[in-house]
Amino acid sequence: GTFADVSEKSGILKSPGTYGLGVIVFDFDNDGWPDIYVANDSTSSALYKNNHDGTFTDIAIESGVAYSADGKPQAGMGVSVADYNADGLFDIVKTNFAGDTSSLYRNSGSGWFEDQTFQAGLGRITRFLGWGASFLDFDNDGWADIMLCNGHVYPEVGETAAESGYRQRKVAYRNLGDGKFIEASESLGPGVMEKAPGRGMAVGDFDNDGDLDILVNCVNDVPQLLRCDSSTKNNWIKVKTVGVK
């Protein structure tokens, strides 16, 4: 097969002058059609609603995911989606530049997202420059937790009260199951606390032991592969599919 560039025809080129750094495809309104969210740096982010005819419409502003809770554009870097409050709807977590918090948008189901960054407990940490973001259930309790990889863009940046230096540790939030999160970075071992110039992250069970592992790619450095050795008694399921001719 071949690919044709339909960017302009589809309508996603109608937002010039933006700096998209993170993107994810998901069905935010459960209509069976994939939509697109773009985390933009220094400008409003975009939520492209699928019009079911090969075109998209940016509805980020009216949906509440274009700006921060106080109406300011943020320097979005990475993005992930999951149903963190188990209501059947995809929610959004977004990393931002240093001096700002990450963003957590809860899907209300009515076409509107509510900024729950501070209410959920993600509004206290601002020293890190976030890149990769992943919803993942790192303790297999059935609730989507959050992992963020970080690293500054300027090697000369030193560690201060406001900045965490060039090489930065990961930040992990444990989902308490009541709409709130608590930072759990230190409890997850030295691999999470090890500092690196992180730029992106992927999650998967690479050793097939039932818990999720993390791969962090770094700029001008080797990647980090963090194997999860869980001591939890919680459950997981493995499915083997068999093809039929």
Regions found by a protein language model. Name each.
Residues 1-245:
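Acidic, glycine/proline-rich Ca2+-coordinating loop motifs
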